[in-house]
UniProtKB/Swiss-Prot annotation:
This is Ribosomal RNA small subunit methyltransferase F. CDD domains: AdoMet_MTases. It is found in: Cytoplasm. Its main location: cytoplasm. Belongs to the class I-like SAM-binding methyltransferase superfamily. RsmB/NOP family. It comes from Klebsiella pneumoniae (strain 342). Pfam families: Methyltr_RsmB-F, Methyltr_RsmF_N, Methyltranf_PUA, YebU_pre-PUA_dom. Specifically methylates the cytosine at position 1407 (m5C1407) of 16S rRNA. The lineage of its organism: Bacteria, Pseudomonadati, Pseudomonadota, Gammaproteobacteria, Enterobacterales. The gene is rsmF. One of its GO terms (cellular component) is cytoplasm.
Length: 477
């Protein structure tokens, strides 16, 4: 791999020299920052087991090296990436894996280190969705996740990734993360705050990441981070777990933010050390029990992770003064819900008791039950999965519902050529058409969408915004 030419401000280098632990080499740090970042993926276990995924891609010649802290994570080397980008492979398009930097898998690994079974989790800064989808997989689509994103332009990307991965237990919000402590006090069993930061750890991916860097900027960012962690801590129930993480390397945005929380609530914060998180974690362990990952340690991005427990209740913040407005959905009565469920089952859609049916005008939605106590307390951008639209002849089943709730045994398998046509938004002409009028189409046993049979043709319903042009997947060799 060709080396990057990374811009390093002198003040940054001086700061890193001072922060570097004695057992690490500063020269190795500079050398690691100049090397291009290794690519990595995470298998989406909501759709496929790790073992089945490895068997599926074995013929492709991909070199997959396990990520020590995430059993679903792998560094990947493959030939032909220029000809066929990883994001255009069949397995990515159908949500079997997520392209995710290895370091960014650490916070969720820390959140679930003791195999907890949280009912309600918040991801405070969620876009583009790598950690939200990782949390959902660890929860098995059970319970509920509030995924918040402050940037309006990134909410759409967040939803697209959640939908592609077949996730049904997420509610999206679009707020400054500092509102939740007052709006949703003690509402969550676990919270991930992957805080906005100066990004010092991402220079291997972006050689110009430090162009606007300054010590003063770091201090300004740290002030915001303190407000975010304070809000998150108020939103956490006593006994719950908070993971604070950044992709930066300075102490002001990392250790100092956590120490500020400790000094503010000394009777209520307990550090949960991460030295046993995975084999080799001790190489990045700080004296406090945090992980401070310099790029040369594991040949990945720089990262910081702290895991905390809330041991006692704290004084609540003043109640917010805004009005949320009337909740625009109503739950379906049991008789109506039974009719919708039966119609969905007939086309091959099924869900568990952790989801309930709600209606807004002609739209039918499936909401995660675990989120219902929060309805009316904050305004949601989106909740759960849009199941269908009601029309004169029945129901128009929505693409995201097919991806989340399709039962593979009620499906019509496409050939590779037919699947490529499907992803290009074209109708499919199989040799033998399915018997039913509507059929869930699959490739590699994974749902791609719902097709309507018109004679010998399968009419494509793939959403226009997802249609792909150019070369798609290569198939088995």
């Amino acid at each position: 791999m060709a080396e990057n030419t990374v811009y390093f401000p002198e003040a940054f280098l001086a700061q890193m020299r001072a922060a570097m632990p004695a057992h690490l080499s500063f020269d190795d740090f500079i050398a690691a920052c100049q090397r291009p970042l290794r690519r990595s993926i995470r298998v989406n276990t909501l759709k496929i087991s790790v073992a089945d995924f490895l068997s599926l891609v074995a013929p492709y010649g991909w070199q997959l090296t396990p990520v020590p802290w995430c059993e679903e994570g792998f560094w990947i080397e493959r030939d032909g990436d220029d000809a066929l980008p990883l994001g255009s492979t069949a397995e990515h398009l159908s949500g079997l894996f997520y392209i995710q930097e290895a370091s960014s898998m650490l916070p969720v690994a820390a959140l679930f280190a003791d195999n907890p079974q949280p009912e309600r989790v918040m991801d405070v800064a969620a876009a583009p969705g790598s950690k939200t989808t990782q949390i959902a997989a660890r929860m098995g689509n059970a319970g509920g996740i509030l995924a918040n994103e402050f940037s309006a332009s990134r909410v759409k990307v967040l939803h697209a990734n959640i939908s592609r991965c077949g996730i049904s237990n997420v509610a999206l919000t679009h707020f400054d993360g500092r509102v939740f402590g007052a709006a949703l006090p003690e509402a969550f069993d676990a919270i991930l705050l992957d805080a906005p930061c100066s990004g010092e750890g991402v220079v291997r991916k972006d050689a110009d990441a430090l162009k606007n860097w300054s010590p003063e900027s770091n201090l300004d960012i740290a002030a915001t981070q303190r407000e975010l962690i304070d809000s998150a801590f108020h939103a956490l129930r006593p006994g719950g777990t908070l993971v604070y993480s950044t992709c930066t390397l300075n102490r002001e945005e990392n250790q100092s933010v956590v120490q500020w929380l400790l000094s503010r609530y000394p009777q209520a914060v307990e550090i949960l050390p991460l030295g046993d998180l995975f084999s080799g974690a001790a190489d990045a362990l700080t004296a406090e029990g945090f992980l401070h990952v310099f790029p040369q340690i594991y040949d990945c991005e720089g990262f910081f992770v702290a895991r905390l427990r809330k041991t006692a209740a704290i004084d609540p913040l003043p109640a917010p003064g805004y009005k949320v407005g009337k909740f625009p959905f109503t739950p379906l009565k049991s008789r109506e819900a039974a009719a919708v469920t039966a119609a969905a089952n007939a086309v091959g859609l099924a869900w568990d008791a952790g989801h309930t049916l709600w209606q807004r005008d002609k739209e039918l939605w499936l909401f995660p039950q675990a989120m219902e106590p929060l309805f009316g307390q904050v305004r949601f951008s989106r909740i759960g999965v849009r199941l269908a639209e009601v029309h004169n002849k029945g129901y128009r089943w929505q693409h995201e519902a097919v991806i989340a709730f399709a039962a593979p045994q009620r499906a019509f398998e496409l050939t590779q050529e037919e699947a490529e046509e499907w992803y290009r938004g074209r109708d499919v002409y199989p040799q033998t058409a399915p018997q039913q009028d509507e059929a869930i189409v699959t490739f590699q046993g994974v749902p791609l969408g719902l097709a309507k049979r018109v004679g010998s043709r399968l009419k494509n319903s793939y959403p226009r915004e997802l249609v792909r042009d150019g070369k798609l997947f290569a198939g088995k060799v």
